[in-house]
Every structure is written in structure tokens, then in C-alpha cells.
Amino acid sequence: MKVLVFYTRRFAYKTAEQNLSDEEIALFYPGSKEIVHEAEHTNCITAFIHIEAEDEEKGLKSREKKLANHLKWVARKNNTSSILLHSFAHLSASKASLKFTAELFHAVEARLKNGNYEASQTPFGFFLDLNMEAPGYSMARVWGDL
């Protein structure tokens, strides 16, 4: 799993182009969960996350704990409790299945919320128009190979 985390004063997105089929997107949105096509977040950790095939071998619980702990650590270093998960499958050639990726993202979001963090996800299966304001200090950008 590769993770590029930014502390962002402001992170806004809007869906631009759907890049997966409706059936593939449905894996991320079970039941009637609605896709939020546009949102703005402030004072948050924005995590660009790439789940790799090897992560499936390590298991969901292991990967969930590792990623959640990493994100909480970065959040504490930046004095925020708001964390935004963004699927970014451009950090490695290896890719996990969509099903595993969806399960992991939902599990991490739930774990963060259970730990009193404000957690959410950008829309999965879309290219997004992004607008990001990130300050220029060391802990505002953290790379992780988890």
C-alpha cells in the first residue's frame, strides 16, 4: 500500500468523468449510499491511497489497522481530527481488486470514526477536478509505503 498524505487548509473536489462501469462503482456504494459529487473540506488530512495486490494477501484487518494508525499519526502531527480518504491508483503498478479496495476504504473510515475522527471519502470511480491548498512545511506532506 502506498500513501501520499497532505495536510490541507482547503481541499475541494467535483466529479469530472466516470472511469469505471456502474457495476464496478456499485461495489463502493452498497445499498442506497449516495455519491457526493462535490464537496469542500478544511483543516484536514487528505490521503492519496493506492491499495496493492499484496495487501490482499496480508488481510483486511492488518491493512485497516496499519492505514488507520498511519493517518491518525499524521493527523495528530498536524493538529486536526479530520481525515479524507482519496483512492489514487497511480502510485504503483500493482493494484488490489476493486472489492478489496472498497472493503478496506469502508473499514478504515469506520475505524477512524470510531476513534472520534471526522472521516470521509472522495467519490470512487471518477476522475475529479481538484482544488487544494496545502502549506509548505515538513509534516504537511508525508509519504508512506505501508
Predicted regions and their residues:
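Non-catalytic terminal extensions that flank enzyme cores
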Residues: 1-20, 44, 132-146
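Alpha-helix N-cap and loop-to-helix initiation/capping positions
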Residues: 59-63, 96-103
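Active-site-proximal loop/turn and secondary-structure-junction residues that shape catalytic pockets
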Residues: 10-12, 53, 89-91, 123-128
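Flexible, glycine/charged-enriched surface loops at secondary-structure junctions
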Residues: 77-82, 118-120
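Short glycine-rich, basic-tinged beta-strand/loop micro-motifs
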Residues: 79-95
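Phosphate/ribose-phosphate-bearing ligand recognition and processing surfaces
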Residues: 93-98, 111
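Divalent-metal-activated hydrolytic enzyme cores
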Residues: 102-146
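Conserved mixed alpha/beta catalytic, RNA-binding, or beta-rich assembly cores of soluble enzyme
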Residues: 9-77
